[in-house]
C-alpha cells in the first residue's frame, strides 16, 4: 500500500487509543487536536467552517464548548478520551479500532465512555473492532467475539453463543475466572498450568497446549486450523466438542 492509498484509507478507518494521556499532543489545543484530521484531508473550506465542525463534534461526544481552547493537561482521563473519540469521528469513518479504550480510566468513568461508544455506533452505523482483556466489557459491547492466545486465533462465535458454550479450553478458562455474585451460577474454575511460551518464536502446534489440561500428542507439531462447529462458531482445537467427556491429562 503506497502513501496515497494509506492516506485515502484513513478516511474510512480510524482508531481510538488506549491511553488518553499519551495519544494527545500536549502542545495542541482541544480544538486543534479534533480539527487536525479535517485540516489534513481538506474537509473544511475555511477556518470558520473548521471551527464549526469541531464544535459540533465536541457536542456529539459530550464535551463543553468552553474546552475548545483548553489543553490536554487541563482535562481528566474521561474527557481526554472523549477528545480522542471526537477526533476519530471527524472524518466520518465506517470502521473504528477501539484499542482498550477504557482500561486506563477510573471505573466510574468507564461506563460513561462505553455507553457513549454504544450510542455513537447506533447513531452513525459504525463498525467497531473492540480490543480488550475485560470480559465484562466484551459481553456488554460485542456482537461477535474472537479469542486469541499468543497472537493465535483460537475461537470465534457470536457473543451470546461463546458465553453460553465456550469450546476452546482457553476460552473456558477465561470465562470461569469471571466473578459471579450468585453462588448458584458459579462456573467450575478452569486452572491453567505451566508457563507461557515465547510469543516471538512459538513452537508449531497449538500455542496453548503446554498449559492445557486436555492436551494430547496431536495438539503439538502442527498448527491447528479453525473448525466450524455450526451457527458461526469456529474453534481451533482438535478436542473441542468432546472436552466434557475427557479426563485431564495433567
Regions inferred by a protein language model and the residue ranges of each:
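Conserved ABC ATPase "signature" region
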Residues: 48-66, 172-176
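P-loop NTP-binding/switch modules centered on Walker-like glycine-rich loops
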Residues: 101, 105, 109-187
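Hydrophobic anchor residue at the start of the ABC signature
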Residues: 34, 85, 109, 113
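A short, proline-enriched helix->beta-strand linker immediately N-terminal to the Walker B motif
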Residues: 90-94
Amino acid at each position: 500500500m503506497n502513501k496515497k492509498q494509506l492516506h485515502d484509507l484513513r478516511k474510512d478507518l480510524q482508531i481510538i487509543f488506549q491511553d488518553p494521556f499519551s495519544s494527545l499532543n500536549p502542545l495542541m489545543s482541544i480544538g486543534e487536536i479534533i480539527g487536525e484530521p479535517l485540516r489534513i484531508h481538506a474537509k473544511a473550506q475555511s477556518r470558520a467552517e473548521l471551527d464549526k465542525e469541531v464544535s459540533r463534534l465536541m457536542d456529539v461526544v459530550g464535551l463543553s464548548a468552553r474546552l475548545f481552547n483548553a489543553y490536554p493537561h487541563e482535562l481528566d482521563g474521561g474527557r481526554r478520551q472523549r477528545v480522542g473519540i471526537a477526533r476519530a469521528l471527524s472524518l466520518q469513518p465506517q470502521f473504528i479500532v477501539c484499542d482498550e479504550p477504557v482500561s486506563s480510566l477510573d471505573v466510574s468513568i468507564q461506563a460513561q465512555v462505553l455507553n457513549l461508544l454504544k450510542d455513537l455506533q447506533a447513531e452513525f452505523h459504525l463498525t467497531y473492532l473492540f480490543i480488550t482483556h475485560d470480559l465484562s466489557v466484551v459481553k456488554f459491547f460485542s456482537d461477535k467475539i474472537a479469542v486469541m492466545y499468543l497472537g493465535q486465533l483460537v475461537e470465534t462465535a457470536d457473543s451470546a453463543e461463546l458465553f453460553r458454550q465456550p469450546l476452546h479450553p482457553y476460552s473456558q478458562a477465561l470465562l470461569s475466572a469471571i466473578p459471579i455474585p450468585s453462588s448458584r451460577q458459579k462456573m467450575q474454575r478452569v486452572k491453567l498450568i505451566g508457563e507461557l511460551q515465547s510469543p516471538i518464536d512459538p513452537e508449531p502446534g497449538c500455542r496453548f497446549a503446554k498449559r492445557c489440561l486436555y492436551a494430547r500428542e496431536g495438539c503439538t507439531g502442527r498448527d491447528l486450523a479453525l473448525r466450524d462447529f455450526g451457527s458461526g462458531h469456529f474453534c481451533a482445537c482438535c478436542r473441542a466438542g468432546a472436552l466434557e467427556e475427557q479426563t485431564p491429562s495433567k
